[in-house]
């Protein structure tokens, strides 16, 4: 019942990558909550690797938040999966089956991993939201100084609020939970505040659905880059500066979003998928 795992850092995003391909047991809610409660294994997302069910993909991944809920996308977690796969000599580029569809990733250098997150979705009915919205670029929703969100789905839904103030001075820990659970979002929402610093860069902070305030969120970085371009604030190729570091985002002419950034190995070992107990080992 030993499942190989790694604790990794995806630009401040705390990620566990677990290889479930040979496991006879699924990861239980008890195990997820136990790992989240342990200071050494506390995580934002768990990325579990499985054999693919589609011939177009090399592997299948599932994504778990720290509260035990499932996510459809996690850009930084996906970059950590790509790093794990390449470190184990399983290839240099991969097509991964995810809850949001098949996405592609590859190692650029020893430290930099790129992931093609696919195309953003601006269709309100597919996000989903609870009321009809004519223009997802400007949505009337307010919390304190935050208003007029831009809604973008990158497999999971993001609300981006652009502000002129220093984003560090806005108490996102206060407004994030309120907006995440707003009745507009029947499946909850990721909440970000962004400040454009030039036509080539912006600063970003994110309250992540199911995880809370986080140092980095890859899909939020992608969503903010797309939102800024839609509003005419930036060009297609920008740097997104997060508390954990910088991600390079390219919103290509073919509508695909490519995210590039570093990953870091913290420790590895084997875990029990039923209980969440683990033993450190070099893995």
Curated annotation (Swiss-Prot):
Catalytic residues in the record: 74 (proton donor), 217 (proton acceptor)
Domain of life: Bacteria
Keywords carried by this UniProt record: Amino-acid biosynthesis, Cytoplasm, Isomerase, Lysine biosynthesis
Chief location of this protein within or outside the cell: cytoplasm
Site (Could be important to modulate the pK values of the two catalytic cysteine residues): 158, 208
One of the protein's GO biological processes: lysine biosynthetic process via diaminopimelate
Location in the cell: Cytoplasm
Residues given in the record as substrate binding sites: 13, 45, 65, 75-76, 156, 190, 208-209, 218-219
Cellular component annotations (GO), alphabetically ordered: cytosol
Protein's pathway: Amino-acid biosynthesis; L-lysine biosynthesis via DAP pathway; DL-2,6-diaminopimelate from LL-2,6-diaminopimelate: step 1/1
One GO MF term attached to the UniProt entry: diaminopimelate epimerase activity
E.C. no: 5.1.1.7
Catalytic activity: (2S,6S)-2,6-diaminopimelate = meso-2,6-diaminopimelate
Assigned protein family: Belongs to the diaminopimelate epimerase family.
PANTHER family membership: DIAMINOPIMELATE EPIMERASE, DIAMINOPIMELATE EPIMERASE, CHLOROPLASTIC
UniProt subunit comment: Homodimer.
Role, per record: Catalyzes the stereoinversion of LL-2,6-diaminopimelate (L,L-DAP) to meso-diaminopimelate (meso-DAP), a precursor of L-lysine and an essential component of the bacterial peptidoglycan.
UniProt protein name: Diaminopimelate epimerase
Organism: Bartonella quintana (strain Toulouse) (Rochalimaea quintana)
